[in-house]
Amino acid sequence: EGTQVPANGMYVVTPKGVVMFDTPWDTTQFQPLLDSISLKHHKTVVMCIATHWHSDKTAGLEYYKHRGIKTYTTILTDELSKKNDKKRAEFLMAKDTVFNFGQYSFETYYPGEGHTSDNIVVWFENEKILYGGCLIKGVDETDLGYLGDANKKEYASTLKRVQRKCRNPKFIIIAHNDWKNIHSLKHSLMLAKKLKRNNN
């Protein structure tokens, strides 16, 4: 959780509506985000998937649920959200799940413990887009950020599983700061290997 820093999310516009990944953590941004999406695309948000239990991903789940948006997390994320008094989703995923929505197909993937014990990524196989959330850091980062709930010894192995699953991504969207460099996953793995060495 740590210090507040700018956070990225992602949404996908389809003929059936907009799918959003993660919520803002600033309560004043919950409705303005919906309004700006509606104004720009003339579509409503119909689904939101949060990628782990920290507030920068889950804070808006309850608000969006009351707005009629289908909200999703994994069962593990829900357990941790409940334990830590965070907002919870309406629908729970028991395993990696493929969603076919409009013309898009994407998969939620749990690669193992890293930033948190429940962090998932979202992989668009056809478009080669990886939404890495807080598990992946930008190339300008010198460390892996907040590690208060991290598995320091498993982080590198988890990132290797992401590499094997999500091959040759064209875009990697990360949770914080600039996401435009395609080498963020490789850079994060280097940082995670260093972290593991320092914690052996």
What positions do the PLM features span?
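Zn-dependent metallo-beta-lactamase
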Residues: E1-K16
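Solvent-exposed, acidic/flexible segments
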Residues: G2-V5, T23-F30, W53-K57, G148-K152, ...
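Structural recognition of the beta-strand scaffold that forms the well-ordered cores
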Residues: Y11, V19-F21, V46-A50, K70-T74, ...
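Divalent metal-coordination and catalytic microenvironments
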Residues: V12, D22, I37, H52, ...
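Metallo-beta-lactamase
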Residues: G17, W25-D26, I75-E113, T116, D118-H183
